[in-house]
């Protein structure tokens, strides 16, 4: 079996908070009924899928770039940085990464960009769910520290 990772991000279009990327390697067989792009799944269903993905995935990596760094290097570079960070946390190292959108400029892992990959490829859908739930949990913590923070997103 070729080891393939799916990669996606959450928070790129948001007004506040970090950008979070996730890389996921799924086994050949998995049971992720209802898996879809995180934007098309309700928050409660995302939480259920998050638990299923984390219990079934071979490996999951998450990269987080905080807002202060986004302001310094821009959102596009921050997104790429978070994606590279997430790939660097995978064990085993994938033979190829499928990136939602455009490919990463990196020689570390061969990769392909797939437009709308979060709508068509399960391993990217899984990465989408992990990134979105992780970011949402961060934003809830921010809102607890700074009331009304969630109203900014």
Feature annotation, model-predicted:
Residues 1-153:
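RNase H-like, Mg2+-dependent phosphodiesterase core
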């Amino acid at each position: 079996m070729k080891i393939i990772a799916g990669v996606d991000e959450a928070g790129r279009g948001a007004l506040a908070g970090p950008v979070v990327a996730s890389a996921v390697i799924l086994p050949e067989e998995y049971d992720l009924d209802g898996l879809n792009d995180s934007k098309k799944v309700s928050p409660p269903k995302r939480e259920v899928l998050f638990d299923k993905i984390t219990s079934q995935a071979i490996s999951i990596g998450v990269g987080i770039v905080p807002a202060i760094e986004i302001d310094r290097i821009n959102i596009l570079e921050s997104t790429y940085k978070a994606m590279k960070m997430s790939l660097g946390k995978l064990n085993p190292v994938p033979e190829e990464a499928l990136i939602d959108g455009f490919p990463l400029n990196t020689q570390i892992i061969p990769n392909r960009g797939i437009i709308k990959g979060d709508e068509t490829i399960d391993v990217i859908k899984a990465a989408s769910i992990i990134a979105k739930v992780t970011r949402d949990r961060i934003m809830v913590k921010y809102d607890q520290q700074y009331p009304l923070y969630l109203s900014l997103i």
